[in-house]
Amino acid sequence: MTDHIRPLIAGNWKMNGLKASTAEFEAMLAGAAEVTGKADLLVCPPATLLAGFADKARGTRAVAVGAQDCHAKASGAHTGDLSAEMLADAGASAIIVGHSERRADHGESDVVVHQKTEAVWRAGLVAIVCVGETQQQRDAGQTLDILRGQLNLSLPQGSTAANLTVAYEPVWAIGTGLTPTAKDVEQIHAFIRTLLIERFNGEGARMRILYGGSVKPSNAAELMAVANVNGALVGGASLKAADFLAIAKGC
């Protein structure tokens, strides 16, 4: 882990969670004091739970609440979509954009991710921009080229350490139980760091780079010890307070 960058453990609940799941979030709030010296915590529930979670967290500063996606426009005739401004109004402090499941399920391009990132900033929030390669791209030896292209096109020129976090999520590792080796993660995060510094200079040196892809309590400490890994984007393991907090303790 890069020592001067405070780590972030971000939980992406994806399309999981009903009102009864508030109990898990309350348990996270209750246990957060044990890890606040190690990392910042962020939970991104489905939009139906966002405002309720934000109300629970208000005044504690123990766990921040975020969103999983937004529309690029501030308002308009976009049935079923939510703007960054709406999510900010509901209590979000950050929004995930460009997750591989959005790219795959909804055909979101790097250009769309770029537009959504700017929308997140327009609402005064932090953008967590996801990049990563598929198994086919990995097998073809295209990982670095794919990441370079995604970063160049997805990240707007105004990116700073304060308004942007990058999340590397190898698509082949998401929800599969598979994870790259610590050496692989180190090489890829070093590559991402180099690209960020080349483009954004000192800001790029201070940006958080999260690792995402089957992060769980049993492998968190090893992954978080890797250079240029400044936290994690956690999927399934973030649904349980005990697992989520255990991952944060690995920082």
Curated annotation (Swiss-Prot):
Which key words tag this protein in UniProt?
Cytoplasm, Gluconeogenesis, Glycolysis, Isomerase
The listed locations are: Cytoplasm
Record carries keyword DNA repair: no
Which Enzyme Commission number(s) are listed?
5.3.1.1
GO CC, sorted alphabetically, is: cytosol
What is the enzyme's main class?
A: isomerase
Primary localization = cytoplasm
User: Catalytic activity annotated for this protein?
Assistant: D-glyceraldehyde 3-phosphate = dihydroxyacetone phosphate
Q: What is this protein called?
A: Triosephosphate isomerase
Q: Which organism is it from?
A: Bradyrhizobium sp. (strain BTAi1 / ATCC BAA-1182)
